């Protein structure tokens, strides 16, 4: 936000509620910007130009009064640009009332533009690594095979991305230092930070159950049938005791939930199977360290048993940043499953994810041949091409799958 502010405004006025908890007292008892801004100016030691500057409120989850004041900044001081950010806002904006979970009454609905920040995508990563190659990447349309030289170069960057993932601090370290050991240490620290955040909220939440669910994601994915099983958490575990823990992790954007479908039909949301789902981690860099995957296994494209699920997590992460609705999967029996199903326009699109180490039997080809959907996608290490009834799209082009279908 500071970088964005410096590039687009005359001056950035940055306030961090976590670093300076006393800032919260400025927002107590008033929501009036004309009373709040002079006090912030004293703290900052500089005048805030309401027409030229930007006000940045970081870690706003630590100050509910500041969050609620955003409505009044919008109404009473519309000429001032205000940006706010916080971790775990998805859960901190919710509170229990009468057994229900609802947003606070004073939450500025309709007054604030909410942006969910996804991890850095492969496309964004490539832009920072090789801007010239990125421009070529962004020009790709249709499904004609790419020249081998570009295919190999893009695959090399994809392999590096798998080791780094998309967490901004980790990506920034990789770009500035290029030290794999430092990258791994930051990823390990983030995993620990996730767990520390969960423990911090113990009492308001059942931290023990949330940690059990979070730590079960990798072993549950590693099963031949990766559907989430409550019984795998601990002996006698039932859904009723852990549903809230899963909802907390999803709202906190620590895990991604992919629901099963009872039919591959548009609209997908009408065919959710609510009690059948898989859980993935939010970022593949964190999945790498939690699963204990060595960087060289990814860079050298080695086969290993968990690789198929790891690459699925990568694909999901790239798809989740696209604005076309939730990603699903389809499984009718243990031997009939399609990795993902996405909604593209008014089409339900089956998706197969293939990695070099993935030897699972697939129902994808049988479904495509029998149902003949308008679009069908296979993400793999092979070059871009129309392959019979489906389009083969290389894994590095997942963020641009829509352009490849044109």
What are these regions (language model features)?
Residues 48-66:
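Conserved P-loop NTPase "ATPase switch" module shared by AAA+ and STAND
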Residues 93-222:
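Interdomain motor-coupling "hinge/lid" segment immediately C-terminal to the ATP-binding subdomain
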